[in-house]
Design a protein with these regions (language model features):
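Cytosolic ends of transmembrane helices, especially the final helix of ABC transmembrane type-1 domains
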Residues: 1-25
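Primarily ABC-family ATPase nucleotide-binding module
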Residues: 25-77, 156, 233-236
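Helix-to-loop junction immediately C-terminal to a conserved catalytic motif
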Residues: 94
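ABC ATPase nucleotide-binding domain helical subdomain, centered on the C-loop/LSGGQ "ABC signature"
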Residues: 103-105, 120, 138-184, 228-229, ...
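ABC-fold ATPase nucleotide-binding domain signature/coupling loops
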Residues: 105, 164-197, 206-208, 290-299
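C-terminal portion of ABC ATPase nucleotide-binding domains
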Residues: 173, 229, 246, 251-299
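Catalytic Walker B motif of ABC-type/P-loop ATPase nucleotide-binding domains
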Residues: 210-214
């Protein structure tokens, strides 16, 4: 009996806070509904306007005075050493974090003005900690989409990443399970194959913007090169950001953004930067030497 009385008192005491919380949630919903609907646009132009960003409880800015325009259909490599601000730039572009100062614009409008769900429909993203699930191959690619043209879209996506021949050779094709949790005859994919499957999942969405954030970080140089050779196919007709600390990918891109300590150190093509930017050329040569040494050890 005492417990019931105590519970009743607690409910009365905390009821006002519950009511305030419900009002807050409702207020957030109304605010979200008041935001702009993002109409389908043929060209998406992103602008970083004097953007600064500092993570909570940190003294240094992760991004400092970033001014950058990303035009529709551009293939960009964003490079720099660990901690240079590459992933922070992506999170700002996705609207997952808000600038401490400055604005990120889409076609001249602050992205915070758009409904977040509408805004994110423009992006397909592959992060370095991607997940492959022990479901069927097709379910890993289409995220359980059962639309009538799903199978054709799956085959197109896996062909673009160079997995079509491998998957077609399996007895059950795209209906093959990955791993043995649900099917003893499930297939095991190598690191490179799993990486390609994650990229195929992003391509299946067929969005206007594809972001690949360190997608080859865990792969050896040979497997990495195989993925790079598919870059033109992957990025065809799309705005593509390739975030990496490995500079071998940059020659496949229209432009290279070099970040250093959260700021743009240089901007240009791979060949321009090799000739004209000491920091970039030194990074490139150090990595080239590292890869050459690795190849010699394998031999």
């Amino acid at each position: 009996m005492t417990g019931i009385v105590t519970a009743h008192i607690d409910i009365n005491n905390h009821g006002q806070y519950v009511q305030q919380y419900l009002e807050f949630i409702d207020m957030q919903t109304v605010a979200e509904k008041s935001k702009l609907k993002l109409k389908k646009m043929k060209n998406l132009i992103f602008t970083f306007e004097n953007v600064f960003y500092k993570y909570p409880n940190q003294e240094e800015f992760a991004i400092s005075n970033l001014n950058l325009t990303i035009n529709s259909g551009e293939k960009l490599a964003v490079v720099g050493e660990n901690g240079a601000g590459k992933t922070t730039l992506v999170l700002l572009m996705l609207g997952m974090i808000e600038p401490t100062r400055g604005r990120v614009l889409l076609n001249g409008v602050d992205i915070r003005e758009y409904e977040i769900d509408d805004y994110l429909k423009n992006f397909s993203t592959v992060f370095q900690d991607y997940k492959i699930f022990q479901f069927k191959i097709k379910e890993n690619v289409n995220a359980l989409d059962e639309s009538s043209d799903s199978e054709d879209k799956i085959n197109e996506a896996i062909n673009k990443v160079g997995l079509y021949k491998k998957i077609s050779s399996l007895k059950d094709g795209i209906n093959t399970y990955i791993g043995q949790i649900f099917e003893e005859e499930g297939v095991h994919f190598s690191g490179g194959q799993s990486q390609r499957l994650a990229i195929a999942r992003a391509l299946y969405k067929n969005t206007q913007v594809v972001i690949l954030d360190e997608p080859t970080a865990a792969l050896d140089p040979r497997v990495e090169h195989e993925i790079y050779t598919k870059f033109d196919e992957i990025s065809k007709g799309k705005t593509t950001l390739y975030i990496t600390h490995r500079l071998a990918s940059t020659q496949f891109c229209d432009k290279v953004i070099v970040l250093k300590e959260g700021a743009i150190e240089a901007l240009g093509t791979h060949s321009e930067l090799i000739k004209n930017n000491k920091y970039y050329s030194e990074l490139y040569e150090m990595q080239a030497e590292f890869y050459r040494d690795g190849m010699r050890e394998e031999e």
